[in-house]
Amino acid sequence: EAWTSEETLKHMPDFEDMLTILNIAQTDKTAAEQKYQATRQNWEQEMNALDEGLEGQTARWANPELNTETWKNTRVPAYIEQSITPDLDGVIWFRKEIDLPKTWLNEDLKITLGPVDDEDICYFNGVPVGQTHGYNVERHYTVPKNLLREGPNVLTVRVNDTGGEGGIYGKA
């Protein structure tokens, strides 16, 4: 909490890295930024290692041929904690099959997800088409026409909720 003293936070292991960064920032903002980026990169590597949808650098759950019969259905926009599970911080994947008519194949497709909390990578037919960091930023992506197919296409969004409420939550 914002009113918790530094002395109290020193006894909470989860705050050790951030307290170190804040103390460094008092004298060397560049060093603090480097420490923050290293801490964040380590955290992302830990999260990616736990993500069953990733196999190394391959987003296997973005594969349009993936069998998702056992996946649960949900509606968006909604926070993950309200629509799926109350205690999730981490990665969750969303998929939607979209049927495109032949007349749509001549131009790039524009996708607007609205805001996503906190980060996302958007795939179309297994190919990444956009990525955004920031919890309150509208997502606007362009799908090149060479990725479009007549009939079924698959939109996949990997959402990384870093804490608090998360998900695809705003109006698109």
Predicted regions, residues:
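Alpha/beta-hydrolase fold catalytic core
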Residues: A78-I84, D89-I92
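Surface-exposed coil/turn segments at beta-strand junctions on protein surfaces, enriched
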Residues: D87-D89, W104-L105, G134-N136, L148-E150
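Solvent-exposed beta-strand/loop surfaces of large extracellular or lumenal domains
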Residues: Q82-I84, D117, Y123-Y141
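An acidic-aromatic loop/edge-strand motif
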Residues: E1-Y79, Y135, K145-A172
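Residues that flank catalytic or metal-binding motifs in active/ligand-binding sites
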Residues: N67, I92-F94, D118, V137, ...
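Short beta-strands within extracellular/lumenal beta-sheet-rich domains
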Residues: L88-P101, R139-Y141
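Short solvent-exposed loop/turn micro-motifs enriched in small/polar/acidic residues
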Residues: V91, L113-P115, G134
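Aromatic-lined ligand-binding clefts that engage carbohydrates, nucleic acids, or primary amines
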Residues: R60-W61, W71, I98, T103-G126, ...
